[in-house]
């Protein structure tokens, strides 16, 4: 059973007074049946509404005619102030209208109209003799500004005033029936059988003369004039305040349609000025035959005219220039007389201009809501104008037409069934071309049509969705998905105009596509020619694979373009193009072959690029022709981009046909051909997508919920022993592994899919399945440390360049080098395996540096797997489109490198973080528990410390302190584990850890909060478990300084010569004791000297050595070996002067920088032997110990380089007086750079001595002195 999710809630929100209907939707078939019933119900109800509206308007009009009680204010009349000649005149107000008064009530007074600037208020503007009273300013002087308004504009002003913004006149009369008369020379002469003033009559005479001049000009003008730009603001040819488009008969086809078309379709020569009747009567209420036409030849008798009364269209756009020609709307057709429910159905097919109810079918104009009225702009593309239906077929009417580039062209009107009927465009903009692909109504239009559309992969449409730019939502509904059987002639005309625009868009798109195919073919011919030579770039087989079916596709579309281009150029509405689309659809089999080969072609192209630098250069620089308007005649494209073009093209084939069919009348000869082409295209896409309906369900996790991205990050994949950087995306139904393609200048990111696994097929491998899996190749620590040193050095160079204000080229070069080194470090450092297994038998291994991240990925995948129930497979097209979408969906936009950080981002903390892990609560049962600590360093997380295991408890109290070195760190993570001594207790995932992760959490290291160097307590919550911590931070500028000795007793902080003299020994006792204990039981301890010891144990040992406690050896035997190693490091760190002394430290730094190996060895050995005796012997003793530790590297993972990294700064770091650090610690970048330089030097000095095979002993004389003399 299909659950209509959200339907009831949405229904109640929309219709709170009614209960939602019950729908039994058990299958897709039930949904389709319910949809058909809904459509049928809407058609029936719309038919009934149209019929009732027909009857209502007829009765309203009949009642108005009988009572002669039209609202005068609605028709623009006010009680005018007495003119000098005493005549009563109609005048217009430009102010906001008030609601119509009730019957018998006097309307409120009116203000005098004010002159308004261009483009303000009513589009019609004030017109001499019509829109202004004679006494208004400058009303009599308008003759010098241009010809007076046309009669059509004069009459349409009444409607403008009705919808204007004026206040009713002070002494306006009650509404009454209006009848006006005009003479062919004198213009308006009577209103309700009362003569008008001489001034009105003279202005009317001027208007009639102007009409005749324009008619003669229009009959003889060239078609080319129609290409003039649409009127904006005040006309350059006429300053009378009337829309220039309406003044020019040729420029404005709407003027022709509204005013020059006879309702009876009889023969009528255009603009015959000498055959007018002396007087004509205008029936305002019912719009008699002469209405809306201006002075025309009347070949019918009065009785014939009365037989065909028409109800005019209503002008709903009070702020549009295009309303200037709009006719009169009687009160009966106003939306104000409809209830809200009636207005909801005012978008039906009946909403059109209609002839008399006794002769023609009734139509009503489209409705707009008041809010839409208020927002209608001068560019409104919905100019409603009254139109009669027929004209003589020999009277050519030229219309302005918008193409996709906004150029006005000319075209002939489509004659319907040979009757020469003119079909008015109710929506298409003639004054302003509608936007090509305008999105104003696009979403609404797509929603209306989605029921009829087949499933297409979600990709942007290449075909235009043409819709009027300023069209209101009520206009948009008329072109809805439910095609009414009563399609009006106006809709037919609109569709045919749209059809030309759609075809123009297809033609432009086809031209671009051909240029891309040409760019693909361009290198193919020379490559084929070179394949037969002794030095081929590619083999013939490789060329055939990469460019498979590209020549055939080019020929198919070249033939299609060559056939379509002349037909669009010689356009008429009778033009047929359906055969071209039908033939194109019949050749889609070539695309089938191309799509099937696409994945192989891409893989082959990538391999060839890697193997052949010449081909790689060619594939990245393919030139395709640009648009004519582009500055550069060609654009650079990669081979991968161009090979995807046909795949993208074929997925959009049905969208183009849908648009074309939507605007092709069913009676047009092209309609069946286009339908056949659409059917072929739909079947083709369905066959490619392999039973597309089940896949759509599998591609959604829940009903109505589409695939979404849950998590993504950069990870290292182990492929045949090699490390590869990948960007991994976790979607709601699959795991996708991609490779970030190399980017050339200015190009956007692109991804290449390596593999994917549906979540229903994914599992995590167990250790039993991994017996044959090889060990993970680990990178030696010294290599990683060397990379870190290089990175620090490059960062220092970048800062030096910035401070020196040198050119950006050097800085950019260094930044590029830094990015390469950081990327290499990120690639080489992870060593923790994260393996996923597919049901088809394939396994994939990722390397992660943090168990926290590994656990997070597992949790997210397992949580999502609970919602996935069905396996599926993606076609190459779907996979490519999904991969392309990753660019927009990704949340991690760049590799986590410090070079990618913004300048204003925090550089992180450098120094030492002391962490005390106190206790944890929230465990449900007693277990053996321990915690580990991770911090981020150089863009990735590493494990830094581990507590002891607290056995058999649900509330462990560790109270252990750790000192963690921070290198640009921003986050501290803690993970809590249950130690599993029974190996079979839990599955050994990844063949790595046998311990169970109980919880994980993290805390941000805020520099502001940690700067006071005081202990701060915090609680980290994780899965119901709470761990209590205390943290304290010592920044690098403080930790680098050695404090001078303030005491002469004890061991720590006392000069080494003083200690050895007091102890009468060559090497301090603390050094000998710690080394002996470590060599006894710590040589195979993983990470010895690198893993932090428990701080409390270290402090206890420190106190014992300081007071010369005789039980110190007993204490050491009971303590963790890492605490003993920590105590030894602490002793050397707290020496008031480094073991290599402040005096010789600069010399050691200079000696290690020598390039000549012989000179370096001589210098370094001489410096070493120049150290004070206690320092030298202690160092040699320690050096031998460290070399023995490194011999166990295979077990303890401590190489010579690792040991040098740990002890270098400890043994050589200068004291405060010799530190090269700046005195001002408020410069973190400078401090960090100085530290990096010193650390590099210190590590290299110690590493040099560790790597020397033998260090010569001091000479015998000195030896005897050193070992015999008591100090």
UniProtKB/Swiss-Prot annotation:
Question: Anything noted about its domains?
Answer: The region involved in binding to ABL1 SH2-domain is rich in serine residues and needs to be Ser/Thr phosphorylated prior to SH2 binding. This region is essential for the activation of the ABL1 tyrosine kinase and transforming potential of the chimeric BCR-ABL oncogene. The DH domain is involved in interaction with CCPG1.
The molecule here is called Breakpoint cluster region protein
Which residues lie in Low complexity bias regions? Answer: 87-105, 123-138, 346-356, 369-382
- Looking at the record, the residues that make up the C2 domain are 893-1020
What organism does the UniProt record list as the source? Homo sapiens
Q: Which residues does this entry mark as bearing Omega-N-methylarginine?
A: 471
Residue ranges, annotated region (Kinase):
1-426
Where is the PTM Phosphoserine found along the chain?
122, 139, 202, 215, 222, 236, 356, 377, 382, 459, 463, 473, 488, 894, 1264
Q: Where is the composition biased (Polar residues)?
A: 199-208
Q: What is the effect of changing residue 1090 to A?
A: Loss of GAP activity. Loss of GAP activity
What is the role of this chain?
Protein with a unique structure having two opposing regulatory activities toward small GTP-binding proteins. The C-terminus is a GTPase-activating protein (GAP) domain which stimulates GTP hydrolysis by RAC1, RAC2 and CDC42. Accelerates the intrinsic rate of GTP hydrolysis of RAC1 or CDC42, leading to down-regulation of the active GTP-bound form. The central Dbl homology (DH) domain functions as guanine nucleotide exchange factor (GEF) that modulates the GTPases CDC42, RHOA and RAC1. Promotes the conversion of CDC42, RHOA and RAC1 from the GDP-bound to the GTP-bound form.
**Mainly localized where?**
other
What are the start and end residues of every segment in region (Disordered)? Answer: 67-173, 185-247, 286-392, 416-476
Show where the Rho-GAP domain sits.
Answer: 1054-1248
